[in-house]
């Protein structure tokens, strides 16, 4: 097949896909909208193994909601945000979602937490015609569109996707370090499997043989067996498909064994708490990230004001998780405002798919969606812990 013919076939396939998605009948809901308010909901881990993420995300969402409402709301309507605690338990997330949709009558589900918890409840959200916006998981199921499933058009994500971000970060590290035996330790769930996919795909693309692949159960606290195995196998680069405490735990075990090896974390490791709690143990850790992590003593302008105000409101240091929660509400408000005074589910969907860009004050890549693309961006950074702080090494990376 000639290149010209091949490109024509590809273009035709894209057009067919776009037409199928655009013309499929999508059920949308108008529940939760009154003359005075818009009801939105979320489920977070406020009491479970990743509550360090959940509490901060919830705080960021509350802060943005208060600011939007103080400025007059969205075309005169105030946001009413309802937050439920899933404890990072898929069964509880399902119950929370049913309550939010059936009892509270939420218009949108925004910023829901975690791959296994979001996955367990996603069909409930979409089947009800409720938009699922900007969940705290970058797994493919949160943005990948299936033309045979019209309700897929109700899901959007604005985080760097796990597979693509892992591939970009691995490409950077392989070119930087030239490892002979790159290995991976990952959480045994949708998140970890996406990171594993990115790891395997990028090594295959670069013709590098993968080393040990070892997993752990969600909620685990002992990683001695995994670390000992990778050390014995001669791994010279370790990708961590972990969150916060697992990252610190894995690197602590490596230090106990006197094992000096380069660690690269997937995007959920790129948070302030890792160097704050891990201290010297995590010094030198690399990670894929979406935004430069701001620090109060070096931040400027609106970002510095935001950091100061967050600390006043919640009595705790701001972090990346809070920024993500804040931006989830701000992004929703941007597109809901664009949808106009006569807000409906269909008009919100049209606004989201319009191609208009939302720009975060925190410097994340612009969020932009279309009828055939419900992922805001795939560009990432690679950062490293240096002297107890995350430092950007390279930005605008893609594989």
Model feature map: region roles:
Residues 1-39, 397-399:
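Short, low-complexity disordered leader/linker segments with a strong preference
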Residues 310-322, 333-390:
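Segments of small-molecule ligand-sensing domains
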Residues 46-49, 86-91, 114-119, 137-142, ...:
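Solvent-exposed loop/turn segments at secondary-structure junctions
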Residues 93, 157-181, 222-224, 247, ...:
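Hydrophobic alpha-helical segments within soluble ligand-binding/sensing domains
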């Amino acid at each position: 097949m000639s290149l010209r013919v091949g490109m024509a076939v590809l273009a035709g396939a894209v057009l067919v896909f776009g037409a199928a998605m655009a013309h499929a009948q999508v059920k949308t809901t108008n529940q939760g909208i009154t003359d005075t308010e818009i009801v939105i909901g979320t489920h977070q881990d406020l009491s479970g193994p990743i509550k360090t993420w959940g509490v901060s995300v919830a705080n960021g969402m509350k802060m943005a909601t208060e600011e939007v409402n103080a400025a007059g709301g969205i075309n005169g309507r105030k946001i009413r945000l309802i937050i439920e605690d899933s404890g990072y338990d898929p069964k509880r997330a399902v119950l929370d979602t049913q309550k939010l949709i059936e009892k509270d009558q939420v218009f949108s589900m925004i910023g829901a937490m975690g791959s296994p918890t979001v996955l367990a409840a996603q069909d409930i959200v979409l089947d009800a015609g409720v938009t699922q916006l900007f969940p705290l998981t970058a797994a493919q199921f949160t943005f990948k569109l299936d033309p045979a499933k019209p309700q897929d058009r109700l899901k959007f994500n604005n985080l760097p996707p796990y597979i693509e971000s892992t591939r970009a970060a691995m490409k950077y590290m392989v070119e930087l370090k030239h490892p002979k035996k790159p290995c991976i330790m990952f959480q045994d769930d949708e998140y970890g499997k996406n990171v594993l996919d990115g790891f395997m795909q990028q090594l295959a693309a670069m013709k590098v043989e993968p080393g040990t692949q070892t997993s752990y159960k969600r909620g685990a606290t002992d990683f001695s067996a995994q670390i000992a195995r990778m050390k014995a196998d001669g791994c010279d680069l370790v990708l961590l498909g972990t969150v916060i405490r697992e990252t610190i735990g894995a690197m602590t075990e490596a230090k106990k064994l006197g094992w000096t090896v380069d660690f690269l974390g997937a995007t959920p490791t790129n948070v302030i708490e890792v160097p704050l709690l891990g201290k010297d143990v995590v010094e030198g850790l690399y990670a894929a990230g979406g935004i430069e992590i701001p620090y109060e003593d070096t931040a400027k302008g609106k970002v510095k004001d935001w950091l100061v105000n967050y600390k006043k409101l919640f009595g705790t240091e701001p972090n990346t998780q809070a920024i993500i929660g804040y931006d989830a509400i701000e992004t929703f408000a941007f597109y809901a405002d664009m949808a106009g005074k006569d807000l409906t589910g269909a008009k919100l969907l049209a606004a989201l798919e319009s191609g208009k860009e939302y720009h975060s004050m925190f410097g994340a890549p612009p969020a932009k969606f279309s009828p055939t693309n419900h992922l805001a961006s795939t560009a990432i950074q690679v950062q490293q812990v240096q002297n107890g702080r995350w430092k950007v090494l390279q930005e605008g990376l893609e594989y």
